[in-house]
UniProtKB/Swiss-Prot annotation:
Superkingdom in the source lineage: Eukaryota
Binding residues annotated for substrate, in chain numbering: N71, K73
Pfam families, per the entry: TIM
Gene for this chain: TIM
Record-level Gene Ontology MF annotations: triose-phosphate isomerase activity
Protein name, per record: Triosephosphate isomerase, chloroplastic
Pathway: Carbohydrate biosynthesis; Calvin cycle
InterPro entries reported in the protein's UniProt record: Aldolase_TIM, TIM_sf, TrioseP_Isoase_bac/euk, Triosephosphate_isomerase, Triosephosphate_isomerase_AS
Amino acid sequence: MAATSLTAPPSFSGLRRISPKLDAAAVSSHQSFFHRVNSSTRLVSSSSSSHRSPRGVVAMAGSGKFFVGGNWKCNGTKDSIAKLISDLNSATLEADVDVVVSPPFVYIDQVKSSLTDRIDISGQNSWVGKGGAFTGEISVEQLKDLGCKWVILGHSERRHVIGEKDEFIGKKAAYALSEGLGVIACIGEKLEEREAGKTFDVCFAQLKAFADAVPSWDNIVVAYEPVWAIGTGKVASPQQAQEVHVAVRGWLKKNVSEEVASKTRIIYGGSVNGGNSAELAKEEDIDGFLVGGASLKGPEFATIVNSVTSKKVAA
């Protein structure tokens, strides 16, 4: 289904009606949060400004490189994945982007052995502790053994189809981090929660579960994926996505630290494709994407990676 922009969710134009648990100060100030953070958070990458691209710098609220992950989910065969790898290997990708793909577990070794080193590998899930008698699960140690550097945790399909709870997901993140994997920490609300004005409450509760469990945010990327936009063809407008990203950054500042808020990359997912990624990328607090279906098409995924160019401003 072709993606269409959802500029106003049905019967509700905002994100919140009545939600006592959300700090009032955070609500009133979240839209101006970016203007209060230190200008040093506007970076090309972790390198010094003397190495900036002559085309300009990347203006984004999270420090580090633009981040694009491809979640292949439960898709593919050996042959189709070989074709996808070939397309990715031949693609021209912007240098100032961290690129990660997440194949089904059974194909990770195939991907790792033939995919360009330019692209890192992620698991789609991991167990909450050391491996053992846990039928059907995948351990962090196994992912590392196959060369993975990241793992996706808290994806809505794990939360709402498999039934994983916030606290359990937080513990999984803590274990993965303790063993040296980076975590793509997913949060996001369902349509009925957005319509009820609970977007912030839901996202903040999911964030809190991560914050309560993890020892550090140094190797975490937060992925905001509104459930109503995943695989539906509906896409949050750039303004809708930006509003939530700013609120998430504000929550991190208030509840974790200003340093974590300024450093953490917050990426968007939910029917991102080659046609809408450039407009989404222009928003200052959208630090990249977590891509589903479009990541199964090599040329389109490359277009999404290269949408970082729309984020560049004159130095």
